Amino acid sequence: MNTTTSRWTSLTRVALAGVCVALAACSGPSRPKPTEIQGVPVLQDMRTSWTANVGKVDFPLVVSAREDRVALANSQGVVAVLDATTGKDVWRLKLDQAISAGVGSDGQQLAVVTRNNELVTLQDGKVQWRKSLPAQSFTAPLVAGARVFVLTADRSVIAFDGATGRQLWTQQRPGEPLVLKQAGVMLAVKNTLVVGLSGRLSGLDPNTGVIRWESAIATPRGTNDVERLVDLVAPFDRVGDVVCVRAFQAAVGCVNAELGKGVWTRPSAGEMGVSGNDTLLVAPLSNGVVQAFNRSNGERLWDTERLKYRILSAPLVTPRGVLVADNGGWLYLLSLADGALLNRIKLDSEELATAPVFAGGRYVVVTREGRVTGFQMP
């Protein structure tokens, strides 16, 4: 898969009726060839525990990791919950429609959005209810507080009753005429629904949809709609009340979601989301350079060019290091201290479909071909 092209063709224009029309691929200079990596020292063991298959994934998948289970889906409508310790199915169900966004879950109820703009909730391998949406969605629904929240491509946030599917409220914010066909940002912080709307994090009342606060991560600039695109992209990183995010090709930053105030922002030209811990935040750039920032103040801690010119996945910061994959099917482990390469393993010939997750004592990755791998780092 040509990832660079697919990311540009993933831009869609939202018409007034909420219909998205795909744009043609944008041309640009050819990407320099990455330097061959040879003689990687094994400074941290990475052991494969199990492999499984979910089927091809060509939508912005989000894997929901809860305790010892992971919930995931493929493009053709299969939704599955796996035991993260063994890779075995807890349950698996084939829907009658292809999937465009998911999986959202609170550990019990799951939610996905189909390409026919239908929100579908499931529990224990059975469909609970379905509701039509006014527009496409590329962001996994948020299941929280007995509600299901959806962020649609026309930048509307819609809340549904989790038990019945009854629509509770809708909130729409004006934005740029383009939207990414990429998972956005939506999470619950205490009694606030936090949503990425254009280049801002917005805090909404989950009961009414009223906006309580907004904090800018990036401001649209440029001479055309593509250059002005600064949507916030998944994955985000949360520690306590502070949520850190990336604005597409513009910046990274952190916001105190309890106070509704920005903590810091820094320029950062990347396309994928971020990951961090109590002290640092890791954010790959579009050119394959990986950067780490001080989480409290945004100061640059380190960057590494070891993976330069590779097309990288979103990262996962672990106690053992930073996991990040490239479009050639390699999974790398980088040092938390300085970004040095600690190990790499071959997963598949394809890129990852989403960022790695942790559940059941295993790190779980999913490739575009649908290969699911669980591994440990003893």
Regions found by a protein language model. Give the residues of each.
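Bacterial N-terminal signal peptides that target proteins for export
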Residues: N2-L16
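C-terminal motif of bacterial Sec signal peptides marking the signal peptidase cleavage site
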Residues: A22-A25
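Extracytoplasmic beta-rich repeat domains
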Residues: P29-S64, W91-G107, Q128-A144, Q167-K190, ...
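Structural signature of WD-repeat beta-propellers
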Residues: N74, T114-R115, T152-A153, G196-S198, ...
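WD40 beta-propeller blade core
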Residues: A80, V120-T121, I158, S202, ...
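Short loop/turn segments that connect beta-strands within beta-propeller blades
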Residues: D83-T86, Q123-K126, D161-T164, P206-G209, ...
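Loop/turn-rich, solvent-exposed surfaces of beta-rich toroidal or solenoidal domains
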Residues: L280, P284-A292, E299-L333
